[in-house]
Amino acid sequence: MTLENRSTCLMTCQSSLLPKKPRFLSQKMWAPHLVVAYLIFVTLALALPGTQTRFSQEPADQTVVAGHRAVLPCVLLNYSGIVQWTKDGLALGMGQGLKAWPRYRVVGSADAGQYNLEITDAELSDDASYECQATEAALRSRRAKLTVLIPPEDTRIDGGPVILLQAGTPYNLTCRAFNAKPAATIIWFRDGTQQEGAVTSTELLKDGKRETTISQLLIQPTDLDIGRVFTCRSMNEAIPNGKETSIELDVHHPPTVTLSIEPQTVLEGERVIFTCQATANPEILGYRWAKGGFLIEDAHESRYETNVDYSFFTEPVSCEVYNKVGSTNVSTLVNVHFAPRIVVYPKPTTTDIGSDVTLTCVWVGNPPLTLTWTKKDSNMVLSNSNQLLLKSVTQADAGTYTCRAIVPRIGVAEREVPLYVNGPPIISSEAVQFAVRGDGGKVECFIGSTPPPDRIAWAWKENFLEVGTLERYTVERTNSGSGVLSTLTINNVMEADFQTHYNCTAWNSFGPGTAIIQLEEREVLPVGIIAGATIGAGILLVFSFAALVFFLYRRRKGSRKDVTLRKLDIKVETVNREPLTMHSDREDDTTSISTATRVMKAIYSSFKDDVDLKQDLHCDTIETREEYEMKDPTNGYYNVRAHEDRPSSRAVLYADYRAPGPTRFDGRPSSRLSHSSGYAQLNTYSRAPASDYGTEPTPSGPSAPGGTDTTSQLSYENYEKFNSHPFPGAAGYPTYRLGYPQAPPSGLERTPYEAYDPIGKYATATRFSYTSQHSDYGQRFQQRMQTHV
């Protein structure tokens, strides 16, 4: 519909609605009707599309946190009149600035129809219902609810910041979150770990909008809670992250005690240290020690030291620590290893034949013991428990039983208990007894059974006697703990007494018991025979001891024939090396002969039938320990001295083996290594004519064969060049030459280095020495000095 049509319609409608003017009415009567018609026209005009006033945006429900800004929208179309806001039905005023409400104002463009209500710094009082009204258009928006959220004003735990508690006493931790809207939610934390089980309640304030939340958490404080932190977190929609407050616990508790032993396992009598380690809040006031429930008067510290016995295994040692809150007592037993100790003693038992008997014996020991029951004089184990059960006993079961306890590697103990079985007397004397002819003799009759005999009588030949004297015979009765002894004493025993049988009969309430005893003669050795045997045994013992001493002496003497080295640090050797090609006959002897005795035999083989080499070459060895203690005045330094007298040394001299002629062969090599001292002793002889060796040097001291004043030093090294000399006293032998060539006697000229005829089988014996087996003797003309350290 166009505007022209719309105007035409309006005019038509208006004319149709107006009453027709009667011709007889005046103009004043038509005036009210014109006003009504006008209003109807305006209303219809506004109702038509494109021309009516309406809300394009109305306020909606909102939530705002106290202190924040809130805007309620209101937008009108086709309206240019007055707009106002109401709060819970109360008009706030007109215009943009609402002077009565400083935090309120209408914002937006009026040309655009925007009449928004802005609230700054929202408060609890702003929590209401709001409405936008177009007064001239008689329009009202929907009601919008503005909800103001208020966080808890304060969160507090009662009793903080430090709460003093008693260990073991339950306590409720209480947290309060005040004046929150909506009511706050409370969560508990213990050292950062969320706790469950809290009980929560709320209280509504007088304004009817805010609430206070109360939460209680039940705890059981212990000494481990000292310093523990509990946190209360309160939150609502106004503060999602919440507010927190914390408290710390201070728990008073009696001492917490740990009792230790060092060492933990001990033997009886050893020392033990008890240590009482304790923690307490408040501080410890003192210590008390007790053993087996009895106070130890002189122990007041945290350590107690004592020597333990077996009682510490069964009687605990206790340590009591106390403070203002209370005291704590801790006890412990000591693992004491001890020998068996009896707890229940076995009791002697008397019973009748056919009864059952139980013997009891209780021991204690540590480590666990082994218990055995045996009968005296028997090794058969009858039981391994504390009790020995004997069923249907007879008189044969009577006797002494042994209860033995064994603690491995610690000790053994035992107790004996007798068992008496009532019955007729049992005589336990020997059936054959002895006496000496002419002396006083005794025949004994012992009854160890129970009950004791009422009567004991002796009968022999035609004689009968219970007690008293009859001619040479006397009967006596003696009571002891083990039984009754009746003794028949015979004065001046005769031959007829050995031909008689003696009847001993005893009676008690259970009947009689009889034994037949034979008396036999005991032969006595004369005193002279006994004395002679004793003396002979003593003499034999003396001779045996002397033989043993002599044997040990000879054995020790024989063991001193070895040669020992007194100095082990330095040795000097002078070794000649000869080509084996010059003396082919020496090859077989190089490794087979190495002792001093064989060397002497090689040199003096012609005298071996007349001289006892074993005696002449006796070596007196000084013990190794003494040799080590001897000191070298040169501190191990060795000298090789030429053209000087040979120093006095412990050497075997060979003067007895040489003929005292002007020219003699000296069997000793020029280089001598003392195998007793370890020092090198070298004498260098010049290559002089044969006359230079006309006499033998006088020995430095007497040297008898087998002498004990020196230690023989037998050095048989290959020696240096000597002049040739005929062997004294043996003209028939070929000339014996060693070493470098010398001027030969007439008729024996040879070229230099020409081989000479050997003397006998052992011509190469002088090549052997006490040097190492690996020494090289293959080169004749190469001389070397060896130093061994």
Swiss-Prot record:
It is found in: Cell membrane. The modification Phosphotyrosine is found at residues 637-638, 654, 657, 756. Residues 694-712 have a biased composition (Low complexity). Residues 1-47 form the signal peptide. One of its GO terms (cellular component) is plasma membrane. The keyword Iron-sulfur does not apply. Interacts with TJP1/ZO-1 and with NPHS2/podocin (via the C-terminus). Interacts with NPHS1/nephrin (via the Ig-like domains); this interaction is dependent on KIRREL1 glycosylation. Homodimer (via the Ig-like domains). Interacts when tyrosine-phosphorylated with GRB2. This is Kin of IRRE-like protein 1. It comes from Rattus norvegicus (Rat). The gene is Kirrel1.
